[in-house]
Amino acid sequence: MLRGDLDVSRLIDYIKRLKIAVPDLKTGCVDAYYKFYEYPELVKVCDIILANFYPFWEGAHVEKASNYLQKMFEITKEAAKGRQVIIAETGWPSRGDNMDAAEPSKINAMKYFINTNIWSWQQGVDLFYFSSFDESWKIRQEGDVGQSWGIWDKNEKLKLLG
């Protein structure tokens, strides 16, 4: 929904068709967390909600980013109406341009990584961290910040060691 590739009615139709074809499979979709709040009709056909949370893109300072993530999660849980919510993507870039109070840096990326993983472990929230490696191919579309979300760089070197 976020990118506008598909309208909600078509996505709902695809989910319904999948549920008929594979009835024992938990079915849902992945999108930005607020899209599930905006489209309750989409939530109704999902068994599970997979939401992307990026406090960086919303300009949160790294010291407040974990609390911001928790608020995003609560908004999504409310929209999910009892369905399981999995954080499908979250992360922090290590370089690039600031987004309001959000500053990309190796230190900030590690702070966010540690804080979000501690919180998710303590709360029993499933979380996928984005990303394992930098994606240098993204520089054309998203600049330095878009290619710099990895825990390791493009040469498989752990960023915090260098």
Predicted regions and their residues:
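Generic structural signal for well-ordered alpha-helices
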Residues: V8-K19, L69-K77, F113-N117
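Aromatic- and acid-rich polysaccharide-binding/catalytic face
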Residues: D31-Y68
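Glycoside hydrolase catalytic-domain groove-lining segments
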Residues: Y54-N98
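Aromatic-rich peripheral "rim/lid" segments of glycoside hydrolase catalytic domains that contact
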Residues: N98-K106, W119-G162
